[in-house]
């Protein structure tokens, strides 16, 4: 269930529990036969697996949820976080750019991330090669958030393994699922508000 469908089901059925109970008929109406929702034991196992990976859930409507996300039309109802969630409540700027960036591009990314970080901004990017990598590396000491398209158990790109560890320890990773095995180039789960 995607974000738009989640909110539509919630609006139609009033509560998440009621929406879950109606999922099989919603799936049938969408042409999906024999849909069987996961049981409570699966949900508990997923939660434990996330906690074991060092991740915790942040739900919309809780104090940990970033206020800026509420302004998004497709604000995630929840997401996983690994690292320092207090970074979500500081002023944040996104720095993204070319994966195959020139030395001028990566140099400018480092300069902007350093300068803005010193002014109190958290730098947010997607941990891709090039500009993203340069921005995160420069902002480790002042605050950085990496928005991942995959999970914490598969680093993509592989050359960012050490940077990912540093962000886990000194920044924040946010993601849809803490163990999605197949991150895909160009996929970022959310826009940072």
What would you call each of these model-derived segments?
Residues 57-193:
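Glycine-biased, small-residue-rich flexible motifs in mid-sequence functional cores and linkers
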Residues 1-62:
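Short, small/acidic-rich helices and loops at N termini and domain boundaries
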């Amino acid at each position: 269930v995607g974000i738009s469908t989640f909110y539509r089901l919630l609006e139609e059925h009033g509560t998440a529990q009621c929406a879950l109970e109606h999922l099989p008929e919603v799936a049938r109406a969408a042409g999906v036969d024999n849909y069987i929702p996961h049981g409570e034991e699966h949900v508990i196992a997923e939660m434990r697996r996330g906690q074991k990976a060092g991740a915790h859930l942040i739900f919309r409507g809780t104090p940990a949820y970033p206020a800026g996300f509420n302004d998004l039309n497709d604000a995630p109802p929840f997401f996983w976080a690994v690292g320092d969630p207090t970074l979500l409540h500081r002023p944040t700027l996104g720095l993204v750019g070319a994966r195959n960036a020139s030395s001028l591009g990566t140099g400018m990314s480092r300069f902007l991330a350093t300068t803005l970080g010193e002014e109190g901004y958290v730098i947010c990017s997607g941990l891709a090669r090039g500009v993203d990598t340069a921005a995160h590396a420069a902002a480790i000491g002042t605050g950085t958030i990496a928005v991942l398209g995959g999970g914490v158990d598969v680093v993509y790109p592989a050359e960012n393994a050490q940077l990912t560890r540093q962000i886990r320890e000194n920044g924040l990773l946010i993601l849809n699922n803490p163990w999605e095995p197949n991150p895909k180039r160009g996929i970022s789960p959310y826009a940072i508000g």
